[in-house]
Amino acid sequence: MLVSTESISLNYLKYSETSVILKCFTKSDGLKSYLLKGVRSTKKKSLNIGLFQPLTILEIDANHKNKGNLESIRSAKISKAFKTIHLDIYKNTIVLFLSEVLSKSIKEEEKNTRLFEFIKESLIWLDQSSNFSNFHIHFLVKLLNYLGISPEKTNLNLGGFNMLEGVFCIYDQSEYCINGRLVDNFKLFLGTDFDANLSEINSLNKRKELIEFLIKYMQIHLPEFNRPKSLNVLYELFK
């Protein structure tokens, strides 16, 4: 079936000398993998490998057989051109990190318009913003909701957080229970927008602490999720 849809590229793997396997999150059908034959060849004119950089928002015409095999793309073009993301090393590094997180966390091969629009609008916000130091933390916290693993937002007055149950609680020193500054800082991100002025989160250590917590939380609740390799690059750049 020929489908025309918006799509967000997640990553691609080299396949043979001239081809790649591209993973995309499509607006029409959720997660899809495509075999792009000859796309790395200098002779290939219809599709350019440069179109498929991580988290590029595309408009594609694709053949979807929906049999669990690799699909094919007939044509692709930029749907929303970024002005700053690919030119700003800090934004670009954040995008590489988030593309890896999304690749590891999105597994559903079905339509999820809410998740698609969240990712798209988040990227547009990042591209237009000059104050994005906490963007990736906001993104991860919001992503939990779309993945169905967002923590309960009741009992916010309690000082502990049980990572296994995803609830705020009285701190009890059990394996999955945390408290202190980390819990207080996590609460700041619940229900806030990207442009929230969180002056308390003003150092690399605080951001790193929150990111490590969120990654661990995702590992607990998403069995196949493992630590993104791009984290170390992110930390190195922002230190």
Language-model features: where?
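Non-catalytic alpha-helical scaffolds and adjoining flexible linkers that form interface surfaces
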Residues: 1-20, 25-239
